[in-house]
Design a protein with these regions (language model features):
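N-terminal signal-anchor transmembrane alpha helix
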Residues: 9-35
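C-terminal ends of transmembrane helices
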Residues: 27-30, 103-115
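Nucleotide and nucleotide-moiety/phosphate-recognizing core
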Residues: 10, 14-15, 60-63, 71-110
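A generic alpha-helix surface/boundary motif
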Residues: 24, 45-46, 72-73
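Short conserved micro-motifs on helix faces and helix-strand junctions that flank
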Residues: 19-20, 65, 112
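Short, strongly hydrophobic alpha-helical membrane anchors
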Residues: 1-9
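Cytosolic, membrane-interface loops and tails of multi-pass inner-membrane proteins
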Residues: 28-61, 115
């Protein structure tokens, strides 16, 4: 693969992987798996850490927070290193993958684009 194809592949992979990873909502998943309820129908209706902690409490809420942070941090770290290696643009890789992680968090494809 030539250098230009590698760069384009890396850009597409960063966008898709960051978006899809950040679109996973652990509060929704954990509320359904562990409590057999949908957090979006309880409390404030917000499917996030604060509502999860308010409704269910416990240590599991802190796991939700940790996974919420990691779902964006891991792709940003991985792709910033890959961008550094292939294009010498570490900061661009972090910002680029971070942007798509924000989009995935706010408009997740897994939940009909409702974050």
């Amino acid at each position: 693969m030539d250098e230009q194809a590698i760069k384009i592949t890396l850009l597409l992979a960063a966008a898709v992987c960051s978006y899809l990873a950040a679109g996973v909502n652990y509060a929704v998943i954990f509320s359904k798996v562990f409590y057999h309820q949908d957090i979006r129908t309880l409390g404030s209706g917000n499917p996030g850490f604060t509502n999860f902690k308010r409704v269910f409490g416990g240590k599991l809420a802190w796991v939700v927070l940790l996974l919420d942070l990691l779902k964006a941090a891991i792709p940003v770290i991985i792709f910033s290193m890959l961008f550094e290696h292939f294009m010498l643009l570490r900061q661009f890789g972090a910002v680029y993958s971070g942007f798509f992680a924000m989009l995935g968090h706010a408009y997740p494809i897994w939940y009909d684009f409702k974050g």
